[in-house]
């Protein structure tokens, strides 16, 4: 089946996560996509376990789940929803039970691989949960009319999926402004102190390698789980709104997110769109977003502090990476991404 060839569409989006209840990047991407689609005249309702996002211009349908294994309960609850009034069902997770819950077009976006996360996440119980979610992703790719991955590497786990549409960044919000750059050499981190984002490891590398060699160096960390005294020169910014986050990027001399795993890595694209050189460990998302290091600096975790020090002291290299990053970031412009989805919504099977 196909959605109407012309006119506004009625779109149901599924996302367990939204910015109102989670820091998971998928929720932020869904919020951005839904907002842009509404601006283009479409009707969008997001079905989520999270509460509505303050100020959101799209509709919200709360699918409550509780107890253990909440994501699995959420997926089962979706099977009781009648999506028949929509032209498009666009799922960003948890649609693997939705066979025969027909709409004109059922699209699934896979934002990364839970199998990849299962290889890295600590704890046997979490490894098992991620493995089960990985199998649910495989099932969902069969249930949907068409499945999309956000980076080529994700196809490792589902090679039958051919279409790639990257995540999108709002270039009207994340853009360069040289007048806002900090006077002091400033590194920005967006993530979590613990686990795979490895903020704690970045802070240790900053204190060990950067502070002794770069005068007045600062590390600004957008995270909520850092200790009260993270170390000299380290400033915890907590949770920022959109305008504050954009300003933080514009202040930065360099951006660093040394994750063990990213399915895509939206903060890399936000930094590049803001004209900020990117430094990262060579996780699969960073390799894709930076074009295998052509538009960013990829280095092992043990050398991350040394690489940041060299970059802060080398204005020519910062300018080279800034220009390369801006050029690469055009691929991830939100409007280009939504153009691709609009075509997919109306495509023939």
Spans of model-derived segments:
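Active-site proximal beta-strand in glycosyltransferases
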Residues: 88-90, 100-120, 148
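Membrane-proximal helix-turn-helix segments that form the acceptor-binding/catalytic region
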Residues: 127-147
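Carbohydrate-associated surface elements
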Residues: 153, 168
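Conserved donor-binding/catalytic core segment of Leloir-type glycosyltransferases
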Residues: 178-197, 203-207, 220
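Conserved acidic donor-binding segment of nucleotide-sugar-dependent glycosyltransferases
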Residues: 238-239, 291-303, 310-316
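Short alpha-helical donor nucleotide-sugar binding micro-motif in glycosyltransferases
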Residues: 240, 247-252, 341
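Aromatic "clamp/platform" in nucleotide-sugar-dependent glycosyltransferases that forms part
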Residues: 260
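Short hydrophobic beta-strand element within catalytic cores of glycosyltransferases
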Residues: 277-280
């Amino acid at each position: 089946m196909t959605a109407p060839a012309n006119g506004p569409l009625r779109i149901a989006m599924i996302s367990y996560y939204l910015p109102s209840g989670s820091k998971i990047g998928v929720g932020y991407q869904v919020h951005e996509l839904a907002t842009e689609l509404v601006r283009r005249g479409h009707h969008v309702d997001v079905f989520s376990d999270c509460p509505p996002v303050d100020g959101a211009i799209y509709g919200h349908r709360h699918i409550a789940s509780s107890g253990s294994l909440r994501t699995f309960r959420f997926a089962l609850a979706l099977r009781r929803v009648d999506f028949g009034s929509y032209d498009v069902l666009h799922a960003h997770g948890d649609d693997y039970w939705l066979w025969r819950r027909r709409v004109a077009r059922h699209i699934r976006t896979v934002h990364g691989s839970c199998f990849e996360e299962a290889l890295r996440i600590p704890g046997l119980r979490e490894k098992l949960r991620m493995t089960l979610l990985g199998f649910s992703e495989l099932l969902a790719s069969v249930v949907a009319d068409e499945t999309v991955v956000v980076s080529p590497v994700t196809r490792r786990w589902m090679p039958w999926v051919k279409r790639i549409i990257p995540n999108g960044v709002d270039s009207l919000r994340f853009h360069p402004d040289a007048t806002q750059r900090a006077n002091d050499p400033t590194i920005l981190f967006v993530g979590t102190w613990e686990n795979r984002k490895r903020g704690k490891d970045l802070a240790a590398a900053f204190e060990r390698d950067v502070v002794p060699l770069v005068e007045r160096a600062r590390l600004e960390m957008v995270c909520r789980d850092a200790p009260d005294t993270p170390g000299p020169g380290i400033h915890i910014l907590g949770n920022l709104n959109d305008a504050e986050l954009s300003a933080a990027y514009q202040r930065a001399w360099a951006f660093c997110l040394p994750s063990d795993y990213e399915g895509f890595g939206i903060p890399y694209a936000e930094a590049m769109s803001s004209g900020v050189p990117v430094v990262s460990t060579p996780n699969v998302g960073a390799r894709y977003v930076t074009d295998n290091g052509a538009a960013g600096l990829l280095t092992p975790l043990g050398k991350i502090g040394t690489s940041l020090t060299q970059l802060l002291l080398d204005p020519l290299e910062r300018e080279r990476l800034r220009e390369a990053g801006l050029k690469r970031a055009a691929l991830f412009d939100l409007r280009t991404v939504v153009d691709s989805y609009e075509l997919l919504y109306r495509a023939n099977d």
